[in-house]
Amino acid sequence: MEPSTSTRKHFTINDFEIGRPLGRGKFGRVYLARLKENHFIVALKVLFKSEIEKEGLEHQLRREVEIQAHLQHRNILRLYNYFYDDTRIYLILEYAPGGELYKELQRHQKLDQQRTATIIQELSDALTYCHEKKVIHRDIKPENLLLGLNGEVKISDFGWSVHTPSLRRKTMCGTLDYLPPEMIAQKPYNEMVDLWCIGVLCYELLVGKPPFESSTSSETYRRIRQVDFKFPSSVPAGAQDLISKLLRYHPSERLSLAQVLKHPWVREHSRRVLPC
């Protein structure tokens, strides 16, 4: 029985057996944990209130909780519930035993066509669900993609996400290598920023580094603004076609998520397995 947001129980830290650390960030740590009551395994994200207040991130955290708690999709990490005490905030998250996609990429340096196409298909399906719910992720990158028991992708870290209001957004956020041109130019943007990120991710998974990576941030900015990237010969023609149709300067010229899911290279190489 998962500790769902729909249950009215108020949790405390005493409801959990705490296991090994799974990761650490600027504002706290994530631990493997088990509910004493029914032995349900979770990841417990422990955040320090003082750090969050010092950085003025209360609003961002509230937004992350509000967004992630309402998303239920097999390729999105579940946020089951949350609680807090005088000094800490605890997020009860789905445990993703495969760890970060970033670590898989580091281990193998680059991924093959099948693995990459499968990830792109899973990610595009999850983002279709997000966009239908008027949520833009804005920070898709290997560090924010976790892996389930069978290697399936789970989008995590909705800290930068936004519920899209009717007015298009202008704040710059996300990771430098993955920033789209419209964010660098501080122009209004829409959900097509996530399509740019899918293109960058697909390139990085197949090549082992992002397409606009440079020795200085100003050079990276320049290359993004000019959409200046080249494919190594190792990248298959079908993948080149997909990536080049996603990494377009004008958001309206990028493929839609539906077109990514129908793209011949994705359909031919994806080995996505759906649950029965």
UniProtKB/Swiss-Prot annotation:
ATP binds at L22, G23, R24, G25, K26, F27, G28, R29, V30, K45. The modification Phosphothreonine is found at T171. Expressed only in testis. It catalyses: L-seryl-[protein] + ATP = O-phospho-L-seryl-[protein] + ADP + H(+); L-threonyl-[protein] + ATP = O-phospho-L-threonyl-[protein] + ADP + H(+). InterPro entries: Aur-like (IPR030616), Kinase-like_dom_sf (IPR011009), Prot_kinase_dom (IPR000719), Protein_kinase_ATP_BS (IPR017441), Ser/Thr_kinase_AS (IPR008271). Serine/threonine-protein kinase component of the chromosomal passenger complex (CPC), a complex that acts as a key regulator of mitosis. The CPC complex has essential functions at the centromere in ensuring correct chromosome alignment and segregation and is required for chromatin-induced microtubule stabilization and spindle assembly. Also plays a role in meiosis and more particularly in spermatogenesis. Has redundant cellular functions with AURKB and can rescue an AURKB knockdown. Like AURKB, AURKC phosphorylates histone H3 at 'Ser-10' and 'Ser-28'. It comes from the Eukaryota. Changing T171A: Impairs kinase activity. Okadaic acid, an inhibitor of protein phosphatase 1 (PP1), protein phosphatase 2A (PP2A) and protein phosphatase 5 (PP5), increases AURKC activity. AURKC is also stabilized through its interaction with INCENP, which also acts as an activator. The active site is at D139 (proton acceptor). One of its GO terms (molecular function) is protein serine/threonine kinase activity. The keyword Cell division applies. This is Aurora kinase C. Component of the chromosomal passenger complex (CPC) composed of at least BIRC5/survivin, CDCA8/borealin, INCENP, AURKB or AURKC; predominantly independent AURKB- and AURKC-containing complexes exist; in the complex interacts directly with BIRC5/survivin and INCENP. Interacts with TACC1. Keywords: ATP-binding, Cell cycle, Cell division, Centromere, Chromosome, Cytoplasm, Cytoskeleton, Kinase, Meiosis, Mitosis, Nucleotide-binding, Nucleus, Phosphoprotein, Serine/threonine-protein kinase, Transferase. It is found in: Nucleus; Chromosome; Chromosome, Centromere; Cytoplasm, Cytoskeleton, Spindle. Its EC number is 2.7.11.1. One of its GO terms (cellular component) is nucleus. Residues 16-266 form the Protein kinase domain.
